[in-house]
A protein has these predicted regions:
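Calycin-type beta-barrel ligand-binding domains and close structural analogs
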Residues: 3-21, 83-180
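Amphipathic/hydrophobic helical signal segments and adjacent flexible N-terminal regions
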Residues: 1-97, 171, 180
Length: 180
């Protein structure tokens, strides 16, 4: 499906229907996020700089907290693992369980913390098409680029995440999430 690029831009054209374009962009993002609600089994593969590849299986639950809020929609991301693994011994900065709250405001997702630290962060969002979003975040010397695509009528999510620390690529993460 071809999309009108002006609805995906963060800069709205100077025309009389620019508010309509903004509403379409916002509703497209809200619709995409609503397709992610539920519990997902996440199979992850981590490539760390100059280390062996590490695999991990986790669960993530995505909930919408306040559907009727006119200031933005709030989501809660809860993750956990059900199997013991040495991943968290090798990588103590990662948490085997946790919660992040996030609010969607237009083309930005404001999160209570990042995955690599406890600092609040904002991700800028670009919509590739009706199935894929790109999130771009910067916090505490980290720059994170994440591509998330819904596949096969939303039964699967594919995530590719690239993380640079002080301008050096440190982590590449591939995930396949299966809707439970």
């Amino acid at each position: 499906m071809m999309r009108n690029k002006s609805t995906e831009s963060t800069q709205l054209p100077n025309c009389s229907n620019s508010e309509e374009l903004r509403i379409e962009f916002d509703s497209n993002l809200r619709r995409w996020f609503s397709r992610n609600i539920g519990v997902w089994r996440s199979r992850r593969q981590y490539f760390f700089e100059e280390e062996d590849v590490l695999n991990l299986e986790m669960f993530i639950k995505i909930e919408e907290l306040n559907k009727n809020n006119t200031n933005g929609i709030k989501y809660q991301f809860t993750w956990w693992t059900e199997t013991e693994t040495d991943f968290f011994i090798k990588k103590p900065n990662y948490k085997k369980e946790g919660v992040i709250e996030a609010s969607l405001f237009g083309h930005q997702l404001q999160k209570s913390s990042g995955y690599l630290n406890n600092s609040m962060c904002i991700s800028n969002i670009r919509q590739v098409d009706e199935h894929e979003l790109i999130f771009e975040s910067s916090y505490d010397d980290w720059y994170v680029l994440e591509h998330t695509r819904l596949i096969d009528q939303d039964k699967f999510r594919s995530r590719n995440i690239y993380s640079w620390f002080k301008n050096k690529l440190k982590i590449v993460e591939n995930q396949l999430l299966i809707w439970n």
